[in-house]
Amino acid sequence: MAVKRAPSKKPRPVEGRKPKKNPLFAAKIEHVDYKDINLLRTFISDRGKIRSRRVTGLTPQQQRQVAVAVKNAREMALLPFTSR
């Protein structure tokens, strides 16, 4: 038997969410370079994890480029693997 839930108190927006701004399109960057540490730090959380597409607003291709660039920068010791 299913239990009926009370309706949520907060009404949902009717029009939906507006898409996030793409930071790479805004900066007119076509290729992500692993040596551009300031750019890569915007896509890394304070714990050292790569942020998801939902958070960053990147396209799938750009997200893959960022992930590869971050991993290369970590191997070259330009970025830490974790933050303490």
Curated annotation (Swiss-Prot):
Gene Ontology MF annotations: small ribosomal subunit rRNA binding; structural constituent of ribosome
Organism encoding this protein: Rhodococcus jostii (strain RHA1)
Function description: Binds as a heterodimer with protein bS6 to the central domain of the 16S rRNA, where it helps stabilize the platform of the 30S subunit.
Keyword terms: Ribonucleoprotein, Ribosomal protein, RNA-binding, rRNA-binding
Chain intervals with Basic residues compositional bias: 1-11
Region named Disordered: 1-21
Coiled-coil residue spans: none
GO biological process, one term: translation
Record protein name field: Small ribosomal subunit protein bS18B
Assembly: Part of the 30S ribosomal subunit. Forms a tight heterodimer with protein bS6.
InterPro entries recorded: Ribosomal_bS18, Ribosomal_bS18_CS, Ribosomal_bS18_sf
Gene behind the chain: rpsR2
UniProt record similarity statement: Belongs to the bacterial ribosomal protein bS18 family.
Disulfide bonds: none
Keyword Ligase belongs to the record: no
Example of a GO cellular component annotation carried by this entry: cytosolic small ribosomal subunit
Domain of life: Bacteria
Pfam families: Ribosomal_S18
